Structures are given as C-alpha cells and as structure tokens.
Amino acid sequence: MASKEILFDAKAREKLSRGVDKLANAVKVTLGPKGRNVVIEKSFGSPVITKDGVSVAKEIELEDKFENMGAQMVKEVASKTSDIAGDGTTTATVLAQAIYREGVKLVAAGRNPMAIKRGIDKAVVAVTKELSDITKPTRDQKEIAQVGTISANSDTTIGNIIAEAMAKVGKEGVITVEEAKGLETTLDVVEGMKFDRGYLSPYFVTNPEKMVCELDNPYILCNEKKITSMKDMLPILEQVAKVNRPLLIIAEDVEGEALATLVVNKLRGALQVVAVKAPGFGERRKAMLEDIAILTGGEAIFEDRGIKLENVSLSSLGTAKRVVIDKENTTIVDGAGKSEDIKARVKQIRAQIEETSSDYDREKLQERLAKLVGGVAVIHVGAATETEMKEKKDRVEDALNATRAAVEEGIVPGGGTAFVRSIKVLDDIKPADDDELAGLNIIRRSLEEPLRQIAANAGYEGSIVVEKVREAKDGFGFNAASGEYEDLIKAGVIDPKKVTRIALQNAASVASLLLTTECAIAEKPEPKKDMPMPGGGMGGMGGMDGMY
C-alpha cells in the first residue's frame, strides 16, 4: 500500500480552499446573460467551447492531490444539481465557494465548525420556505419561453422552440435533442406512439417512392413469442381477410415459413399485412406490448395468460386510425383504446416512476408514459460548425431542463434577485449561540454572491447592484442584459424555483461538510527516479578521422 500524506487544521483547509477557488473561478465566468465562454482542450478532435457550468467543472483535475479534493467536492455540487434540476450548476458552484470562503475565515478565528454547520442548515431551511412563498406558477407558453430563453443565454429562438414543443406534447411528453443536418434549429413532433422497429421485409412496402408502409384503419396483433409456423397464424389471417382490412403483426420475431407466407399473400394482393419486431427486450418488451394493446383497444397474446395464437379472434385485436412503418420506425396514430384503460395504465406507470431508484428505469418509464399520453418532440439543433453545434446543443439541453423545472415547481424573479429577497427571513431565526449566528450570517452574505457575480460579468460593480436591489420593492431586480433595474417577472427575467432551491441546498450541503473537515489524507506522490546514464559510446570506430 502506498504511503499517505496527512494534513491537519488550517493547512488542510487552506489546500482544500485553493482547490475550491480554482474550480469555482473557472466556472463562474459563465454566469449570467453577459457571462463568457470557456474553451476546453480535448485529447481528440477540436476544442470544446461551452458556457455550461457542469461541463467546465467536469474537465477540471488538479495536480495537487489536496487541492484536487476541494475541487472534486465542488464538482459534486455542480453534478448533483445538474442531475436533479438539469440547470443552475454555475449558481450552485458560486454559492458553494462563497459559503466555504466565509466559513473558513470564521473557523480560523476559533469558531466551532459544527455549530456553524447547524446555523447554515437552519438558514437554508428558512430560505427554501421563503422561495416557495415568492414562487409563481408558470401560467402560459410565453413564460415557459422566457425561462428557456434565459437558460439558453438569451437565445429567444431556443426558448420559443422549447415552449412550442411543450405545448404540443404536454408536461408528460418526451422532448429529445438531436443534431440537425443543416443550419436551422427545427422542431419535429411525432403524434401517437412511435417505437424503433421497422418492417421485417421490404416487400411489405405500400409506398415504393418513400419506402414506407401505410395502413389505414388496420387491425393490430400483439404477440409475445416468435412466430415461425403458418399453422398458428392461419385462423386469424382468414378472419382478417374476410373483413378486408389491413393487419399489423407485432411479435418477438416473424421468420421462416410464417414470414414467407405473409410476403406471398401481400404480393398477390390477398391480404394487406405487415410484420414488425416488438420493441424493447425481456420484461420491458412485455410491458411495451401491453402498452400498445391498451392504446389500440386490443389484447396482448401472452402464453402465461393461457392465450394461444391459433385461438385468437378479431375481438382480441387492437385497431388504430393509421399506422406508418418505415425501415427503422413504426408509428401508431390515434389508437382505439378506451380512455379509462389508458388512464389506469398511465396511473400504474406513474406509480412505478415514483418507486424506482434507477435513473435508467425512470427514463424508460417516462418514455412509455409519454407515448401513451403525450407524444414525442425532437429538437434538431443546427449550426455551421461541429464546435458551435456542441455548444448550442449544451444550451438547448440546459434550457429544456430549466423549463421542465419551471413547469414542475413554478418560477421566481431571476438574476440572483430571489436569493437577495429571501435574506430578510434570516432575521426571524433565533440562533442557539454566537457560532450558530455566524452560520446564519455566512448564508446572509453568500446569498448575495450570485447577483454580485452576474453584475461583475456584465461589467458592473457587484456591491452597488446588490445594495440597490435590496432597497428596491419586491419583484424588482437587476436585469444584467439591459443594465436596467425593473420588475424582473414582467421583463421575463425568471428562474425556475426548483433550480434555485436545489442549487442552494446542494451548495450548503457540500460547503458545510468541507468546513467541518479537520484532517485530509492523500497518497504521497512517488519520488521521481533519475534517468540512468545511457550506454557506452560508439567505440571501435577509429581510423575515420580523415572523412569529411
């Protein structure tokens, strides 16, 4: 085991503090509408230019092990805030730096760090409650667009596209961000249920120009198992042929004799039929087949329910107004399922989302929910170069997360004003002792820091701006984009309350833990070994001195 280096007291805190400052100073230049970009070297490809706090934080690794510990702790603040709220990473980093910086001074002066932490915790609870009291719900598409615009660095195009996407797919809908092939940023909305499985044979195509298969008013068969034998399918095919309607077969797979027979019947015109593989794998596939069956008003054919394919009748099949299938995707539009069945299924999926602890499972459940109730919107981000594309895509994802948070918990005045407005509640807290009071005062001072930094990045004196905002009436604040003091909610300078709350809670949590650190342990760097002397020279080559 490698030997360790141990630092105590002020020495440990000084090293950690240096690491915190190095990371926070790199991140905080991006804060606010006039924040600057950071360029990051990559080991492959062109450098990345970004204004996203968490992207900057993730790139920072410091040479000194103790400084790096401080930096990694603040990186945790940014990452956690990004994971939960999706935005507000720079604000969280600025708050963490301010809380730790103020706290270190007090601990060095002999204050009790544990009591300071208690004071910080009390202050955060009070401020969080006050933020809830000044929160306004997002009322319309315009406010959603404003949140997106602010988060996307005042890009109104991005804000408007996100608001439009949310209006079309609803709160439960899935909105994804992809790279566009052109320069324009566009929105593509898929109505109905779409899954990533295409036709099993190109012979099923009904529109050779577009290479798609379009079925109007088809029956839909959902089968859990692989279909290989024609004998199993014959009864249901005969029933569908009698009513002269198209048929979509969704199964684990259709192959061999069964697939060949379907293709021959399609080519002869005896039956308009298409076979596609079921989406997903394992238990998730089963759940998605059940979703499709409920959406279309049919019954999924599962062996464990005692239903066999050869016994299926038309009443077990689902129907939809239209189905479009291409090489890679199937879209079912306007399924004929009963609304009460769909609502019950939605309720069940929501309960599973609440219960699951896996982020991956939650994401997949939300996708299923969106396909049942809302729809799927895809924002295609366009740019002239790959570097600009990456930077713009980061901003779109931030803005999307911010708007979701705004819809979820409402909005507060932006630009750091909500924090300054909340300072007054700290006067009502009764601290147990002077050390707890010191903890309250740390939060009192730190809550001004985001506004100071936004003002500084815009070229204004932070202290003067903070004083003016504090004296102004409720709702009024500093608009760094225009340099005006105005009603920020009317001006559209708004932040999601969830982002503001999570940023403060995470910053206080990590910074107060760092304050209570009395000892830091890291691996000793291995001493560099001197390079050995090179081997002997080129002896035995005498007699060449006459050569020029």
UniProtKB/Swiss-Prot annotation:
Subcellular location: Cytoplasm
Main location: cytoplasm
Any single Pfam family the record assigns to this protein: Cpn60_TCP1
List of residues binding ATP: 30-33, 51, 87-91, 415, 479-481, 495
Keywords attached to this entry: ATP-binding, Chaperone, Cytoplasm, Isomerase, Nucleotide-binding
Gene Ontology CC terms: cytoplasm
Xref: Gene3D superfamilies: GroEL (3.50.7.10), GroEL-like equatorial domain (1.10.560.10), TCP-1-like chaperonin intermediate domain (3.30.260.10)
GO molecular function, one term: isomerase activity
GO biological process: protein refolding
InterPro entries named in the record: Chaperonin_Cpn60_CS (IPR018370), Cpn60/GroEL (IPR001844), Cpn60/GroEL/TCP-1 (IPR002423), GroEL-like_apical_dom_sf (IPR027409), GROEL-like_equatorial_sf (IPR027413), TCP-1-like_intermed_sf (IPR027410)
Catalytic activity, EC: 5.6.1.7
Record's catalysed reaction(s): ATP + H2O + a folded polypeptide = ADP + phosphate + an unfolded polypeptide
Function as written in the Swiss-Prot or TrEMBL entry: Together with its co-chaperonin GroES, plays an essential role in assisting protein folding. The GroEL-GroES system forms a nano-cage that allows encapsulation of the non-native substrate proteins and provides a physical environment optimized to promote and accelerate protein folding.
Quaternary structure annotation from Swiss-Prot or TrEMBL: Forms a cylinder of 14 subunits composed of two heptameric rings stacked back-to-back. Interacts with the co-chaperonin GroES.
Family named by the database record: Belongs to the chaperonin (HSP60) family.
Protein name, per record: Chaperonin GroEL
Annotated organism of origin: Lawsonia intracellularis (strain PHE/MN1-00)
